[in-house]
Design a protein with these regions (language model features):
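Conserved class I S-adenosyl-L-methionine
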Residues: 1-42, 57-61, 80-83, 156, ...
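C-terminal alpha-helical "lid/dimerization" subdomain adjacent to the S-adenosyl-L-methionine
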Residues: 4-8, 25, 142-201
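Short glycine-centered segments of the SAM/dcSAM-binding site in methyltransferase folds
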Residues: 47, 138-140
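Class I SAM-dependent methyltransferase SAM/SAH-binding core
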Residues: 49-51, 55-101
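A short acidic, Gly/Pro-enriched loop at the edge of an enzyme's catalytic core
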Residues: 100-111
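A short SAM/SAH-binding and catalytic strip from SAM-dependent methyltransferases
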Residues: 111-123
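A short glycine-rich, Lys/Arg-flanked "PGG" loop and its adjoining helix->strand segment in the class I
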Residues: 125-137
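C-terminal lobe and adjacent flexible extensions of AdoMet/dcAdoMet transferase-like proteins
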Residues: 204-211
């Protein structure tokens, strides 16, 4: 797949760190996985899509703790997907793609989850609409990311803007809620929490209700 801007910078940055990503961010990955999984309304035989699956850490954990769940991942970085393919069972399908243009037909998934990906998305409304498109009616989006309500996250974002050109922006809870509603989600809920002194996160949930 030909990489489209602005994901060229994301691909370049994560291709460079893919081999050490899991080690470098081990605490953050573990903490965000636990918080996200705790908020996933998983049912028997649900089909789940992980958008921005990276090296497959969340999919690997879900395959362990919820084995009946049918799992699919998508990510724009081939180097990260290569690592994911080595660690994941062969029945977990992995695809190259980006949030604004998912390579799936309509209404394919019961759950769409995205963990620590949204701050890279240049067109957030397009991405939210696209994730809703692949949800079946009644399906849910569960999105975990940095939260701009926290001062330390806002300061860290300023630092990231100086050193990481792939970074787009983080959002406050009211911005996230507004975008979810504008994108057609119902029953929008957002929880905020901290995993340490630096990282303040939010997990947003919205339901795809058929018009």
């Amino acid at each position: 797949m030909q990489t489209q801007a602005p994901y060229q910078e994301v691909v370049a940055e994560y291709a460079r760190i893919a081999g050490r990503y899991d080690r470098k961010w081990s605490f953050y990955i573990e903490a965000t996985m636990q918080e996200t999984i705790a908020r996933l309304p998983l049912g028997e035989e649900d089909r789940l899509l992980d958008v921005g699956c990276g090296t497959g850490a969340l999919l690997y954990r879900l395959a362990t703790v919820h084995p009946p769940t049918r799992l699919v991942g998508v990510d724009p970085v081939p180097a990260m997907l290569k690592i994911a393919r080595r660690k994941l069972p062969s029945d977990i399908a992995l695809h190259e793609g980006w949030a604004e243009q998912l390579p799936f037909a309509d209404a394919q998934f019961d759950l769409v989850v995205s963990c620590s990906m949204f701050h890279y998305v240049a067109r957030p409304l397009d991405a939210l609409i696209e994730m809703r498109r692949v949800l079946r009616p009644g399906g849910q989006l569960v999105l975990t990311d940095w939260c701009g309500d926290y001062l330390m996250c806002r300061l860290f974002e300023r630092y990231q803007r100086l050193r990481a050109h792939a970074h787009a922006r983080i959002y406050r809870t009211h911005d996230c809620a507004r975008m979810l509603k504008e994108s057609g989600y119902a029953a929008v809920q957002i929880e905020t929490y901290k995993i340490n002194w630096l990282w303040g996160l939010m997990t947003a949930r919205g339901t795809h209700v058929q018009a």
